Amino acid sequence: MESTARLETPIAPPSFDWRQLLRDFYDLSKPGIGFYSLLTTATSFWLASTVFHPVLFLHTLIATGLVTCGGGALNQVIEIEADSQMRRTEKRPLPSGRVSPLTGLLFGVLSAAGGVLYMLLFVNGLASLLAILTLGGYLFVYTPLKKKTHLATLIGAFPGAVPILIGWAAVRGSLGPEAWALFAILFLWQIPHFLAIAWMYRKDYARAGFPLLTVIDPEGNRSALQILNYTLALVPVSLLPTLLHMTGAIYFGGALLLGLGFGVAAIRAATQRTNTTAKQLLYASIIYLPVILVLLAVNKI
């Protein structure tokens, strides 16, 4: 009787881990990209403001965050097979099987579409159009081209720099030379930043079939040239906000010093071409962008 009772005892179903699910959706949204998108949007919003409107600011960040989260999720849905072949991405929610492709697709579509609609309703039409261009360029141009040409890195830098235009458009309803100067800074910054990653993980990218510059040119000659060109071009371009009377001397001096420091890291990476110098360049890029955005914000004229 006792053994029969034990057999008939129901087995409790495994408990649902809400915390793991939240972590998975957090990872699905590509929080690193989201952080930089929100930071650049917030900075350009502040720079464009003569009178700061906190409610509009909040609406702009919410909409941008939703669009960025949706784009990140949809990108991972598209690249699930490639991600499963790369060591740095194989543990992401989709390739690991923790989140189903359908769930990822629904999350991405709802977030992206919700963000665009929210932007249209609570910010303005130009900001909403820019959000659509960001999504379209990222998902339908950059993502498929990554499997076909190394030029995808350059092309992807365009939608990658659009969030800084969204903040400006949210305030002004138009894009002047000041906004395009900010766009140029963000555009140029992305190339050495991504090439540093591409060099460090070139074997991973080759395994997944991505013909990145670091894959098709294993000696690194062309990658080195691009790293140098774009990093050095960033130095004078980063001074444009002062020349356009957006910022003062503190920003000018800080941007010059940051650019020179970034340039030193770029020269080391381009000449030595090791994973160590590529990692140093990556760290330099990670430091450069938030610091220069803070300088823009605090030394606004």
Model-identified regions with their sequence ranges:
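Structural signature of hydrophobic alpha-helical transmembrane segments
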Residues: 119-133, 186, 249-258, 299
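Intramembrane alpha-helical segments
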Residues: 101-171
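Multi-pass membrane catalytic core of lipid/isoprenoid biosynthesis enzymes
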Residues: 80, 88-129, 218-242
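Interfacial loop-to-transmembrane junctions
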Residues: 219-222, 263-291
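Small-residue-rich segments of transmembrane alpha-helices in multi-pass membrane proteins
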Residues: 39-42, 92-93, 155-171, 222, ...
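Cytosolic, membrane-interface loops and tails of multi-pass inner-membrane proteins
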Residues: 3-20, 78-99, 195-223
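Transmembrane alpha-helical segments that form the membrane-embedded catalytic/substrate-channel core
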Residues: 66-74, 136-144, 185-202, 235, ...
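Membrane-embedded alpha-helical segments that form the functional core of polytopic membrane enzymes
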Residues: 39-80, 88, 112-116, 129-140, ...
